[in-house]
């Protein structure tokens, strides 16, 4: 009877160990919040031959330099309308030459606007071996060899999961499943509403070390760097050379699909030599440009003199307006402190989304594996080694250490901002510190419970062997419970930070 209870307890604990080894181990290595923030960033080089941006986007003959447009695309001086808001329209824009970048990053700024609550069909960003000037896949050709990032506006499969951003790769032999929105072919996806936003929507697509990452700026703020995580695909192989492109299409419903800019950067890993610059211009061209610059400079100086003569009352500025007052300086310091807190919370939220996305994939794969083993191999015994258990314990210690570092950093930031606003008040800092202490105690309790389970089920004179896998329970599993506790803890920390910020912002008006 005791042996049966011990085997059942080990079988329930084993999925927890597997999940911790997969997700928390990766968390500590640096892919999540616990990563080293001082990791060197790749070198970025702007590639103008694979980019466009207004104003003066088109030439006198209506073409875009280094790009070819087809279908119903309409270039203008400040943007390219890839597909207008008319029924059954298709358009695309592609680079004329192939790019041969090992790692790259593109930043696309666009608008999708329409009258109705629902729009169609959508917009796609491409990296493909050949140009797909026209076709049925969002205005581009099917059977492409490369990757497409689809901003799908219309819900063809009726599952109410649109607008959505979907990453689909193809080797040139697979037809796109348009009726099901490519659900069975998607490598990764996220649901984001990119239609009718007050500011342009921005997409940052990075292909670095065989990993494709999509970040989205949802267009609610004018901040160009306010990106949030959307999707990531690891171990992705794409053609060594390919064309960048954008396409769009409309159906029975129609939206305007406008692309304001497409900026391409070549990435070079740290430690490697950056790409050699292009051939320098000749001396004759340099002299020509220098003469033009001097001519424009003289015209500018002349215009300045004319303006000063015509507006003598605007010359000069009172001395007291040049320097900021004590109140202005304190207000600026308060705003800067709040802005730093906002940026840190936003960065934590972005990294939390990436961690949750990875954990979601790990839990789903783990659940499928357990179901397969339980259904197909009911008599086979698993085995867990001492090394795996030690790895779990070390991982827990490392996570606790990093949570403590995060707590100290955020507590110090809150203390400084509260001190600037109310030097004599320490109640807000004490309350925040007390909340962090409570969170730390809860984490220690969870760690102690897991250690007790490990020690209780590990006799010193025998190696641990896992018994048969029990039938998959219908109630809440241990893995889902741990994930729920972790998510709830992180959300609680975020709520405390947000409430402290709101209280501090409210106090300064009294």
From Swiss-Prot:
Compartments (UniProt record): Endoplasmic reticulum-Golgi intermediate compartment membrane; Golgi apparatus membrane; Endoplasmic reticulum membrane
Disulfide-linked positions: 190-230
Record site feature (Required for ER export), residues: 501
Gene Ontology molecular-function annotations: D-mannose binding; metal ion binding; unfolded protein binding
Highest rank taxon of the organism: Eukaryota
Tissue: Ubiquitous.
Residue spans crossing the bilayer: 478-498
Topology within the bilayer: Single-pass type I membrane protein; Single-pass membrane protein
Record note on modification: The N-terminal may be partly blocked.
Lumenal compartment residues: 31-477
Implicated disorder: Factor V and factor VIII combined deficiency 1: A blood coagulation disorder characterized by bleeding symptoms similar to those in hemophilia or parahemophilia, that are caused by single deficiency of FV or FVIII, respectively. The most common symptoms are epistaxis, menorrhagia, and excessive bleeding during or after trauma. Plasma levels of coagulation factors V and VIII are in the range of 5 to 30% of normal.
Domain comment as written in the entry: The FF ER export motif at the C-terminus is not sufficient to support endoplasmic reticulum exit, and needs assistance of Gln-501 for proper recognition of COPII coat components.
Function per UniProt: Mannose-specific lectin. May recognize sugar residues of glycoproteins, glycolipids, or glycosylphosphatidyl inositol anchors and may be involved in the sorting or recycling of proteins, lipids, or both. The LMAN1-MCFD2 complex forms a specific cargo receptor for the ER-to-Golgi transport of selected proteins.
Protein name: Protein ERGIC-53
Lineage per the UniProt record: Eukaryota, Metazoa, Chordata, Craniata, Vertebrata
Name of the coding gene: LMAN1
């Amino acid at each position: 009877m005791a042996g049966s209870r011990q085997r059942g307890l080990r079988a329930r604990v084993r999925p927890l160990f597997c999940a911790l080894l997969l997700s928390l181990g990766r968390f500590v290595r640096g892919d999540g919040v616990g990563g080293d923030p001082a990791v060197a960033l790749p070198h970025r080089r702007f590639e103008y031959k694979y980019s466009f941006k207004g104003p003066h986007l088109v030439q006198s003959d209506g073409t875009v330099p280094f790009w070819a447009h087809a279908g119903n695309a309409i270039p203008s001086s400040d943007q390219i309308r890839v597909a207008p808001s008319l029924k059954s329209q298709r358009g695309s824009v592609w680079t004329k030459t192939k790019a041969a970048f090992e790692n790259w990053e593109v930043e696309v700024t666009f608008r999708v606007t329409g009258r109705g609550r629902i729009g169609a069909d959508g917009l796609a960003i491409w990296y493909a071996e050949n140009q797909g000037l026209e076709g049925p896949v969002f205005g581009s050709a099917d059977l492409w060899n490369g990757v497409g990032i689809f901003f799908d506006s219309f819900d063809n499969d009726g599952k109410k999961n649109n607008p959505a951003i979907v990453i689909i790769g193809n080797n040139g032999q697979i037809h796109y499943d348009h009726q099901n929105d490519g659900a069975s072919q998607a490598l990764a996806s996220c649901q984001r509403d990119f239609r009718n936003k007050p500011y342009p929507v921005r997409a940052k697509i990075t292909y670095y070390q065989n990993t494709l990452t999509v970040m989205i700026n949802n267009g609610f703020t004018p901040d160009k760097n306010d990106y949030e995580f959307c999707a990531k695909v690891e171990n992705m192989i794409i053609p060594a050379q390919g064309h960048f492109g954008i396409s769009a299409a409309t159906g029975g419903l129609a939206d305007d699909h406008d692309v304001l800019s497409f900026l391409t950067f070549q990435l070079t890993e740290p430690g490697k030599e950056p790409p050699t610059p292009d051939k320098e211009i000749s001396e004759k061209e340099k002299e020509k440009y220098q003469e033009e610059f001097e001519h424009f400079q003289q015209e500018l100086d002349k215009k300045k003199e004319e303006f000063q003569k015509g507006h003598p009352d605007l010359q000069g500025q009172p001395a007291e307006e040049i320097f900021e007052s004590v109140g202005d300086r304190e207000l600026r310091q308060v705003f800067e402190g709040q802005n730093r807190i906002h940026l840190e919370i936003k960065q934590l939220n972005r990294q939390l989304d990436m961690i949750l996305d990875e954990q979601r994939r790990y839990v789903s794969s783990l659940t499928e594996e357990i179901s397969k083993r339980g259904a197909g191999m009911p008599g086979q015994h698993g085995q867990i080694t001492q090394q795996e258990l030690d790895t779990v314990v070390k991982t827990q210690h490392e996570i606790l250490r990093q949570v403590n570092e995060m707590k100290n950093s955020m507590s110090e930031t809150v203390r400084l901002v509260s001190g600037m606003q109310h030097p004599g008040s320490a109640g807000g800092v004490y309350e925040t510190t007390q909340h962090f202490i409570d969170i730390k105690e809860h984490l220690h309790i969870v760690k102690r419970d897991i250690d007790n389970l490990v020690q209780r089920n590990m006799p010193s004179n025998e190696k641990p062997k896992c018994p048969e896998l029990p039938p998959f329970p219908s109630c809440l599993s241990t893995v889902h419970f741990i994930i729920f506790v972790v998510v709830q803890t992180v959300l609680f920390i975020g709520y405390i930070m947000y409430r402290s910020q709101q209280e501090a912002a409210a106090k300064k008006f009294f």
